Structure formats: C-alpha cells, structure tokens
Amino acid sequence: GPPGAGKGTQAVRLARTFRIPHISTGTMLREAVKSDSDLGRQVKAIIESGGLIDDALITEVVRRRLEGPDVVDGFLLDGFPRTVPQAEALDGFSTLQGPLVIVEIVLSEADVLRRLAARMICSECGTNAQDDVEVEFATCHDCGGALVPRADAAEQVLKNRLEVYRRQTVPLVEYYGGRPTFCRVDGAQFVDRVTESILNSVDAVRAC
C-alpha cells in the first residue's frame, strides 16, 4: 500500500496477534541513521528527500535478518519488498518456509496526503504514532517519548514519496496480484476494522 496507508500500525497489531517477529525495514534504517555512520548519513539523505533505499542494500539487510532463529514459526515484513527486484529476491531466499501471504492496504491519494501531513513520530524510539490518542497527548505508547512531526512531512517531500510509490511500488500489485495468497483491504476504514479485514483475509488464504 502507499505511504500513510497504515502498514506500520497494522504490522504491529498483526505481529502481536500471531506472536511472530515484526521485521520493520524502517526501524532498521532509522537505527542506521541514529548511528551517524557513513551508511546512516546516506540513508538519512535519501529518506529526507522522499526516495527509496537501493534494492541491493535493503535486500541484504532483510536477508540477514531472516536468518535469525526467531523467524522459524513465521514473521511479518513491514516495508519490504517495495520494488519488483526486491520481491524477486525475497522469493529466492532459502530461509523461506511455506507460501508468503501478501496484503495490499488500499488508500486514495487524497487520504494519503492528508494522513502524511499530520504524521508524528517518537523522538526517542522512532516509532510512528499509531492512533489519535497518542497524537492528542503527543506521547509515545511504547516508550513515553515526545512525539514530533516527521522529517519527511513537507508538502514537496510527500509528493515525491507518492511519485516514487507510483513508479516503483505499484508494479508489485501486478507481480503478486495473480497469486492465491494475495489479499486487498480497504485502508480508509477505522484502524480496528482494517485489522479485522486483514485477519479475515489471512484466515481465508490459510484455509485454501
């Protein structure tokens, strides 16, 4: 789904429900930025311009993570794959066991821009605010840190992110769309309803 569709929020909820690790490329990349290493500074510049990280770099980061012992019973990928080459690489990972369930969260461009303009992030742990209560009190549910506007919330950056999404990520729908494990969910619903819709879709796929 597009930026602002609620992928991160749903990923946290689903990982807790299924008791599997939530593997967020965003979290891994933010840790690199915080380290202020050469790699971190490169990542920071790309994120702030609204671009996407190089396929080879992010694919290697994910591949190494999926070699961990905690993914044996399943895992939830958040932020990967974003491009067809990344998806092709994921299909080739030797660590995968069983079919991938792919969920697309659909949201209109108008709703995307509205949500992204209001996005907040924790200044301490880097987690996105997940609901209106967090935003109202400007406090992170996870660590109690202060919420601040995201660095990529400027209007031109938002438009750049949408253009990147249309150019590089939309083709993933064509790549995965014909698979029986592909699900599409309306992201304009209330958060709880989106979660319920995803769970129903996943149950239907697993029953096949």
Model-derived regions, located:
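Glycine-rich phosphate-binding loop of ATP-dependent small-molecule kinases
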Residues: 1-208
